[in-house]
């Protein structure tokens, strides 16, 4: 398939132009005009670039891209990364906030579905846009039972043992913790822990799961990969390169 067609599909499906973002969302580096195989990863890095080349991908789609608000200087690490992509004829496509907020394949929608809750209200306002979701489980469920569905997490167990109202804001989502407390959320799920969240959660009487920044944001690219396979009929592969952060 032609690169322009793949990019057009992704731009439209993810509504790339609907977000004011620090990330330059969309096609960041142009490579091969023909796309036979697409790799998906959380982060743009030399490790993910090399892994994409190793599986003979023509395009790499990531959540955390290479270009954030423009490139000031093409030297050092930036120079080596761009040089590798161009020499490998490997296209790089990034979707940051669009892949957090998407109701079908977004990180937060997928997190909620994994625990048995359908995303309902938009939640977690960031730069004027809500990028997460809140939801209600069908019945009050033990916090430990929910944790088993998501895998290892750092837990602040400051709320009720059984919860029904939940919310998710992946990645560095502690900015929405106050919003969660004010909204009566009983379990708030995010990625990266922040020191200030401890006493805020304790005083707010809320349970908090910290899945890790990486782990909370691999769901979106994995779900988008399945859509690309189904809708475009292109071979696709997920490159799991955890940061343990």
From Swiss-Prot:
Positions contributing to a divalent metal cation 2 binding: 64, 213, 217
GO cellular component: cytoplasm
A Pfam family that the UniProt record links to this protein: DUF34_NIF3
Keyword tags: Metal-binding
The organism's place on the tree of life at top rank: Archaea
Keyword Iron: no
Keyword rRNA-binding: no
Annotated a divalent metal cation 1 binding sites: 63, 100, 217
InterPro entries: DUF34/NIF3, DUF34/NIF3_sf
Single annotated GO MF: metal ion binding
Oligomeric form and interacting partners: Homohexamer.
Family: Belongs to the GTP cyclohydrolase I type 2/NIF3 family.
Protein name: GTP cyclohydrolase 1 type 2 homolog
Native organism: Archaeoglobus fulgidus (strain ATCC 49558 / DSM 4304 / JCM 9628 / NBRC 100126 / VC-16)
């Amino acid at each position: 398939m032609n690169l322009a067609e793949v990019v057009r599909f992704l731009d439209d499906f993810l509504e790339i132009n609907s977000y004011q973002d620090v990330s330059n969302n969309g096609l960041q580096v142009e490579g091969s005009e023909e796309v036979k195989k697409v790799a998906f990863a959380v982060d743009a890095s030399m490790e993910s670039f090399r892994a994409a080349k190793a599986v003979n991908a023509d395009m790499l789609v990531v959540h955390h891209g290479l270009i954030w608000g423009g490139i000031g200087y093409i030297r050092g690490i930036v120079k080596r990364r761009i040089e590798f992509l161009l020499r490998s004829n490997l296209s790089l496509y990034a979707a940051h906030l669009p892949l957090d907020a998407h109701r079908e394949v977004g990180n937060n929608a997928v997190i909620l579905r994994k625990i048995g809750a359908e995303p309902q209200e938009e939640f977690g306002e960031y730069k004027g846009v809500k990028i997460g979701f809140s939801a209600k489980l069908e019945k009050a469920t033990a916090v430990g039972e929910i944790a088993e569905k998501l895998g290892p997490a750092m837990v602040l167990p400051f709320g009720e043992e059984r919860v029904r109202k939940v919310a998710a804001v992946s990645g560095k989502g502690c900015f929405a913790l106050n919003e969660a407390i004010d909204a009566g959320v009983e379990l708030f799920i995010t990625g990266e822990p922040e020191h200030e969240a401890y006493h805020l959660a304790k005083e707010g009487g809320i349970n908090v799961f910290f899945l890790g920044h990486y782990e909370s944001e691999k769901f979106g690219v994995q779900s988008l990969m399945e859509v690309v396979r189904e809708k475009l009929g292109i071979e696709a592969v997920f490159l799991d390169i955890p940061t343990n952060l």
